[in-house]
Structures are given as C-alpha cells and as structure tokens.
Curated annotation (Swiss-Prot):
Example of a GO biological process term: malonyl-CoA biosynthetic process
InterPro entries assigned: Acetyl_CoA_COase_a_su, ClpP/crotonase-like_dom_sf, COA_CT_C
PROSITE patterns: COA_CT_CTER
Keyword Repeat included in the entry's annotation: no
Organism: Ruminiclostridium cellulolyticum (strain ATCC 35319 / DSM 5812 / JCM 6584 / H10)
Gene3D superfamilies for this protein: 2-enoyl-CoA Hydratase, Chain A, domain 1 (3.90.226.10)
Limits of the CoA carboxyltransferase C-terminal domain: 1-235
Keyword terms: ATP-binding, Cytoplasm, Fatty acid biosynthesis, Fatty acid metabolism, Lipid biosynthesis, Lipid metabolism, Nucleotide-binding, Transferase
Classification via HAMAP family: AcetylCoA_CT_alpha
Protein name: Acetyl-coenzyme A carboxylase carboxyl transferase subunit alpha
Domain of life: Bacteria
Transmembrane segments: none
Family membership: Belongs to the AccA family.
Subunit comment: Acetyl-CoA carboxylase is a heterohexamer composed of biotin carboxyl carrier protein (AccB), biotin carboxylase (AccC) and two subunits each of ACCase subunit alpha (AccA) and ACCase subunit beta (AccD).
C-alpha cells in the first residue's frame, strides 16, 4: 500500500473506533465525564477498566460509528474540555498508582473560535507537561488517524504504538499540499514525503511498535494488544517512579538526535 492508501485506510468509516478497543480489551469499564471547569466533551472517552485483574485508566479519542454519533463526538476532534478531562484522569491515575492507556484516532484538535477562546493550545500544552512527568506507566496507541497536536496531547508515553494502517503527522497531506505547494492535486506525493505511516515512523524511532492488523481480523488484534499492553505495564512497574520518569524524558530527548 502507498502512503496515501494508508491515509485512506486510517480514515475508513469501517475501521474500528476507540470504543471497540475498550469493549474488547477491558472489562468493567466505567466512564467519567467533565473537566470540572467548563463541561463534558464527547470526543474524549475516559474512565477506568480492568485488564485482567489490573485497574487501568483508559483515555481515548472517539470519532463515532454512525453519522449521528460522529456529529455528537465532533468527528473525534476534541475541545479544550476534552483534553482537560483527560488531564484530570491522568492525575487521578497517578494518585491511585494506575497505569494509563491512550487510544488515539483524530484528524486533529478542534480549531473553532470557542475552542481557542477556552484555551485549546494551553490545554494541549498542559497535557504534554503532565505526561512527561507522570509517575505511572503510559502506553499510547494510534489506531487510525493521528493528527497534529490533537493526537500528540495523548501521545507522550513510555511507549507509542501504531496499527500498521494508522497514520501520525503534524499536518494532513491535503493541508500540506495546499499550504506548501499551493496544489491539492499533489496530495499523494505529499503523503510519501510526510513519512506518516507506521513503518516510516518506527524506522525513524518516533514510535516503538507496529501492530499488525492480520488482514482486518480485529478480534486477533484485540487479543494481541491485550497481551502486549499487560506485558508492557508489568515491565514498567519494575522501575521506581523516578526511574520511569527519567527513562521517558530521555526517550523524548533522543527524538531527532543526529549521530555521526
């Protein structure tokens, strides 16, 4: 598949959304609502579930599964209150020593006037600052689209995984073609240049694992993820909180480093 083919696959309406992953990986999931500052944002699903016998804080960007739900969830484009809801759950996870698992599927944070007035940039920045210093394990998984800061706001983690047909980029191919080359017809060429596929980002060291989709057999994907998440969480609990934070900080320090 070309890079643009993967862009279209990541956006497919038939692709499982975050709710499917939560339902098939965790049991007894209880959702929490609101940011205690403005309101609730349906684009972000956050709560606690069990992975085996271990309580886990789960935070997910949810696009919705039909037209009505997609509208209610703003197509997965979160407002500031969504990111602040996520932040609230991260802090609770740290307080109660629960690991955090994030599922990311968004074209980007919502960029409307109301979102800007309520501090969209600040909300994303606060998440980045908090996640780099959070004293519990964090696993972030890109399951579809990973668009710009809206995705990054849940992707500062000990490990970042991508499904093989997911994408992760600072800008969409359409946006890049229009802004840089003033030619939307070059979108396929731009998709290759952006290096936004799972294989590209793994080879660059931006992500830590590519999750195979088994030809669309997502039941196997859920089982595979369940095992991998539990294994990784248990691995990181072998380290002290200070060591965990130090390793995470060093991981992001290495991004973009050039070695001779």
């Amino acid at each position: 598949m070309s890079a643009y083919d993967k862009v279209m696959a990541a956006r497919s309406k038939d692709r499982p959304t975050s709710k499917d992953y939560i339902k098939n990986i965790f049991t007894n999931f209880t959702e929490f609502h609101g940011d205690r500052r403005f309101g609730d944002d349906n684009a972000v699903v956050a709560g606690i579930g069990l992975l085996g016998n271990r309580p886990v804080t789960v935070i997910a960007l949810e696009k919705g599964q039909d037209t009505k739900e997609r509208l209610s969830r703003n197509f997965g484009s979160a407002h500031p209150e969504g990111y602040r809801k996520a932040l609230r759950q991260m802090k609770l996870a740290e307080k109660f020593n629960r690991p955090v698992v994030c599922f990311i599927d968004t074209s980007g944070a919502y960029c409307g006037i109301g979102a800007e007035e309520r501090g969209q940039g600040q909300a994303i920045a606060e998440n980045l600052i908090t996640m780099i210093d959070l004293k519990v394990p964090i696993i972030s998984i890109l399951i579809g689209e990973g668009g710009s800061g809206g995705a990054l706001a849940l992707a500062v983690a000990d490990e970042v995984w991508m499904l093989e047909n997911a994408i992760y980029s600072v800008i969409s191919p359409e946006g890049c073609a229009s802004i840089l080359w003033k030619d939307s017809a070059r979108v396929k060429e731009v998709a290759e240049c952006l290096k936004l596929t799972a294989d590209d980002l793994y080879s660059l060291g931006v992500t830590d694992m590519v999750i195979k989709e088994n030809g669309g057999d997502f039941i196997r994907v859920y089982e595979d993820l369940s095992n991998k998440i539990l294994h990784s969480i248990n691995k990181y609990y072998e380290f002290s909180a200070d060591k965990l934070v130090k390793m995470r900080f060093e991981k992001y320090q290495r991004l973009g480093m050039i070695t001779q």
